[in-house]
């Protein structure tokens, strides 16, 4: 079995595993994802690591778990993205095609810079693309006014989308397919190789699509289209009626099916060049998105349940027969796999395990546990069949942020929100495997903390994933298995040399 010459990585944001045909979903159509799955190793035990969007990109592109040290931020000065390694040491042609606005704002501003080339396709979510609506037509739909002011920036961008191909998702897939076609058509030397990363923000909200997608799964809806899901920890808190909930879910499905359709453009390029025998194709996501399951909506401040954390992974590998793997895997393993394929070794500490032995059939597993979490919230550990979420104790303290970039997600939606800057409480510490001093800022209970860490805690959660996949969710915490899973959690945190205060705030230190 020969190693792939080229690699394509397509990350679809907020991709719900249980809604894909390849994973048993029947609610929405995903023919191209299903077509890819039919030629791939389909991983059924793949999980998020750091949440949400940018922490997950850090796991993928840098290979080090982010959430034990900080909430959301750019690449630190002691780290290198894999694209840096490929440029400096491997001579690989690298390309990023993306409509993901967080990659190009404070907190994500340097993930793209070491790609050989990058194409930012504008207009998704709150991307500040236009300052005024397109004055030449009145083609934008009447979007629901039930949304915060910051989200209305999308309405301005939306007036510039005249046809389906003008939407950010289709634009991104067309741009990626065009680049790949050019690369595979070029008269390359035998040593020339390529990595294409498609960071596609769909099916992330807003769940806005043109017809015929918009009415595909809810043709009887007569009101304004609802495209902005609430972030809520209960159905009551969401403010949605039962009928509105059904409609909003249908709009997620519309966006999922639309981006699946345009994904076909990239698959067609690989088909046309007969490049499957020389190309590894990885389809992944950062996390799922609650659409009313357990009463949750969006990505609220709750423990990570299967709909959010148990995610799809498809890998088409040259010479590998289509099959299913139940190996436990997580996002940092994709970084390790890319390093293995291209023969590069990071100098900074990483946490992934290459999946190449599984893909080539020489191993059935590469890890015994996987960590997952949001900075400042529960820490989760998964073994082969169970996931355990340990909730903080004692006011969730001590809690510190470790970073020299000191950039985090802009929180424009929360008036008056101010996260503390480094102050007299800060001191210089070290990150594992690095001699570079890093600012360590403690947070007091009176401090604002980053948005994703806000909210109360509901205690420990332990669930069997096979049960949960079958539609039955039972919190098994409180029994004899708690100690076993707590011991595994402590072992995992100590293995990655997480800050000792993580054990203290979780009540296990």
For every predicted segment, state its role.
Residues 306, 374-477, 509:
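C-terminal, low-complexity/hydrophilic appendages and adjacent surface loops
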Residues 2-9, 108-119, 149-157, 162-224, ...:
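Active-site regions of oxyanion-processing enzymes, predominantly non-cytosolic
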Residues 23-24, 40-61, 73-76, 96-107, ...:
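Short, solvent-exposed turn/loop segments enriched in Gly/Ser/Thr/Pro and often Arg
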Residues 60-62, 238-243, 264-268, 272, ...:
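Substrate-binding rim/cap in mid-to-C-terminal beta-strand-loop elements of soluble/periplasmic
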Residues 59-162:
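Catalytic-site neighborhoods of secreted/periplasmic enzymes
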Residues 1-44, 50, 458, 471-483:
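Active-site-proximal N-terminal segment of extracellular/periplasmic enzymes that hydrolyze or transfer
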Residues 167-188, 232-281, 341, 492:
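A long, amphipathic alpha-helix that forms part
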Residues 28, 206-221, 269-320, 330:
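Histidine-centered active-site microenvironments of extracellular/periplasmic hydrolases
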């Amino acid at each position: 079995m020969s190693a792939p010459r080229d690699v394509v990585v397509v990350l679809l944001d907020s991709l719900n595993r249980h809604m894909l045909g390849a994973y048993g979903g029947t609610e929405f159509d995903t023919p191209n994802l299903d077509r890819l799955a039919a030629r791939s190793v389909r991983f059924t035990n793949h999980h998020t690591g750091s949440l949400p969007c940018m922490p997950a990109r850090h796991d993928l592109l840098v290979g080090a778990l982010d959430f034990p040290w900080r909430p959301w931020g750019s690449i630190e000065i002691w780290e290198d993205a894999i694209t840096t390694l490929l440029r400096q040491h491997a001579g690989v042609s690298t390309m990023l095609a993306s409509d993901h606005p967080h990659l190009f704002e404070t907190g994500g501003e340097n993930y793209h810079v070491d790609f050989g080339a990058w194409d930012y396709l504008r207009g998704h979510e709150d991307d500040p693309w236009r300052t005024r609506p397109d004055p030449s037509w009145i083609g934008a739909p009447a979007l629901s006014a039930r949304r915060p002011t910051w989200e209305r920036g999308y309405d301005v961008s939306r007036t510039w989308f005249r046809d389906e191909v003008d939407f950010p998702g289709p634009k991104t897939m067309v741009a990626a397919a065009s680049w790949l076609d050019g690369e595979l058509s070029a008269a390359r030397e035998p040593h020339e190789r390529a990595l294409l990363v498609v960071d596609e923000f769909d099916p992330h909200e807003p769940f806005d699509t043109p017809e015929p997608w918009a009415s595909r799964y809810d043709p009887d809806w007569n009101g304004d289209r609802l495209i902005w899901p609430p972030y809520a920890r209960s159905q009551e808190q969401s403010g949605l009626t039962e009928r509105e909930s059904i409609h909003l879910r249908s709009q997620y499905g519309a966006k999922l099916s639309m981006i699946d359709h345009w994904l076909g453009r990239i698959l067609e390029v690989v088909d046309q060049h007969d490049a499957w025998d020389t190309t590894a194709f990885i389809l992944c996501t950062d996390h799922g998105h609650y659409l009313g399951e357990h009463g949750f909506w969006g990505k609220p401040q709750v423990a990570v349940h299967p709909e959010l954390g148990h995610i799809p992974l498809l890998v088409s590998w040259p010479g590998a027969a289509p099959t299913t793997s139940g190996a436990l895997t997580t996002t940092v393993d994709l970084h390790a796999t890319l390093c293995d394929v291209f023969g590069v070794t990071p100098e900074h500490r990483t946490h992934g395990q290459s999946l190449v032995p599984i893909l080539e059939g020489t191993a059935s597993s590469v890890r015994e546990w996987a960590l997952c979490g949001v900075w400042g919230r529960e820490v989760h550990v998964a073994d082969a069949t169970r996931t355990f979420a340990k909730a903080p104790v004692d006011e969730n303290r001590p809690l510190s942020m470790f970073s020299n970039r000191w950039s985090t997600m802009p929180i424009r939606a929360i008036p008056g929100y101010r996260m503390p800057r480094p102050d007299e409480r800060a001191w210089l510490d070290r990150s594992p495997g690095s001699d570079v001093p890093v600012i360590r800022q403690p947070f007091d209970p009176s401090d604002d903390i980053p948005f994703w860490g806000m909210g109360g805690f509901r205690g420990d959660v332990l669930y069997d994933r096979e049960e949960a996949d079958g539609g039955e969710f039972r919190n098994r915490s409180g029994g004899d298995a708690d100690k076993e899973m707590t011991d595994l959690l402590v072992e995992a945190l100590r293995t990655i040399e997480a800050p000792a205060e993580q054990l203290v705030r979780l009540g296990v230190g």
